[in-house]
Amino acid sequence: MRIALKIAYDGTKFYGFQRQPDLRTVEGELIKVLKKLGIIEDVKEANFKGASRTDRGVSALGNVIAFNTAKPELAEARILNHHLRDIWILGKAEVPEDFHPRFWAKNKIYRYYLFDEGIDVIKLKACAEAFLGRHDFSNFARLEEFRKPVREINRIDVFSRGRIIVVEIEGKSFLWEMTRRIITALKLCGLGVLSIGDVELMLKEKVDKKLPPAPPENLVLWEVGYEGIKFEVDAYAIEKVKREFLERFRKYLTKSAILEDWLISL
């Protein structure tokens, strides 16, 4: 039986998603636990695949993995989450034998969290319009030989939440560092460093120097969408995950308040 799992993880605790020798990665930890519980024995035989190989520091609330197993009853959120740290199983689905979480994806949604450093949100939103549609993103990505640079952005939504600006980007597929380089452009537009015309030119012509990618820690792979795949949710497991998220939220919020007071006092 082939099983797909929807997963969340704190990317700051890992050296990226993809397995690397002697480094803690999301894929490596998942495979280790799946083998430990006897859910899979061999990675190749299990045809283990992931939807997105997120970079070091990038987190996820909706990445997806899939594998073949003779013990699907053990691939449950409450069982797996007990053995995982900084990774959480949020849903499970039985999928066709040829299901590949990357190639079957209908869309991917990313969220980036920007601290408002005097950013003009109206200018940022206007700049976002330039990225919509189908473009050559060579100037906004770290290119790989085997991947074509043309991609399509379905939508970019921008909304403020206190001192944080959230940018949500949706497309079918993304190039390496593409999302984070788009974010850099949007931020610079919002700060008045770049104009919409500059961005439009970069989408049409090659440039000598590319914009750097925005820091990975503020990027979240929010969702990977599929046609006809419905993930079952274990309510008990989700409640445990929410409690853990709440504890982390309290910790970071308190630390944020301390740092704010230090800044005010100095």
Curated annotation (Swiss-Prot):
Swiss-Prot/TrEMBL keywords: Isomerase, tRNA processing
UniProt name for this protein: tRNA pseudouridine synthase A
Signal sequence segment: none
Reaction equations catalysed: uridine(38/39/40) in tRNA = pseudouridine(38/39/40) in tRNA
E.C. number(s) listed in UniProt: 5.4.99.12
Family to which this protein belongs: Belongs to the tRNA pseudouridine synthase TruA family.
Enzyme class: isomerase
Active site: D55 (nucleophile)
Positions bound to substrate: Y110
The protein's role, per its UniProt record: Formation of pseudouridine at positions 38, 39 and 40 in the anticodon stem and loop of transfer RNAs.
This protein's encoding gene: truA
UniProt xrefs under Pfam families: PseudoU_synth_1
GO biological process: tRNA pseudouridine synthesis
Gene Ontology molecular function terms on file: RNA binding; tRNA pseudouridine(38-40) synthase activity
Keyword Isomerase: yes
